[in-house]
């Protein structure tokens, strides 16, 4: 299959298996959920009655005071006591096979092509790390919500895009399923397309 290169008369021949796959919603959902789960910090921690600092002495005798019986000031029903089912740090990451991950990326790229959201350009670069310059370049291309993918990370582009809303710059190694579906348009250079095909082969 062929992808039209914007601003050029030629088309880029690409692999049908990478850019022409069927849309697999279940697979994409599973991979995106796993990706989001892996980003969770999972470091929250509370103390049980065994871990709260304090005396283990019985506050008052069992009988004869008229008060409710109590054996421990660290009881969960007491103020500043322990937590009954205390949360502990945990790893939320889910295992995703390489074949599944690559399949999800291919499925997303193919759907982007079908929806005319994948914009292929010969090159995408600016002379200086100026946000104003990049903003104008995107405006000229009628883009205001875009992920820009280059073969290698362009420092000028990266620095210029940091202060632009809904604009991000990645190299091929930095793409992920969430970023691919988060933007309205995905701008990718010809060299980056070739690298993506090699990576997903």
Swiss-Prot record:
Keywords, alphabetical: Ribonucleoprotein, Ribosomal protein, RNA-binding, rRNA-binding
Name of a matching Pfam family: Ribosomal_L4
Keyword rRNA-binding: yes
Protein name: Large ribosomal subunit protein uL4
NCBIfam families: rplD_bact
Subunit structure: Part of the 50S ribosomal subunit.
InterPro entries: Ribosomal_uL4, Ribosomal_uL4-like, Ribosomal_uL4_dom_sf
Family statement drawn from the similarity comment of this UniProt entry: Belongs to the universal ribosomal protein uL4 family.
Organism domain of life: Bacteria
GO BP annotations listed: translation
Its biological purpose: One of the primary rRNA binding proteins, this protein initially binds near the 5'-end of the 23S rRNA. It is important during the early stages of 50S assembly. It makes multiple contacts with different domains of the 23S rRNA in the assembled 50S subunit and ribosome.
GO molecular function, one term: structural constituent of ribosome
Keyword NAD: no
Location of the region described as Disordered in the Swiss-Prot/TrEMBL record: 44-71
GO cellular component: ribonucleoprotein complex; ribosome
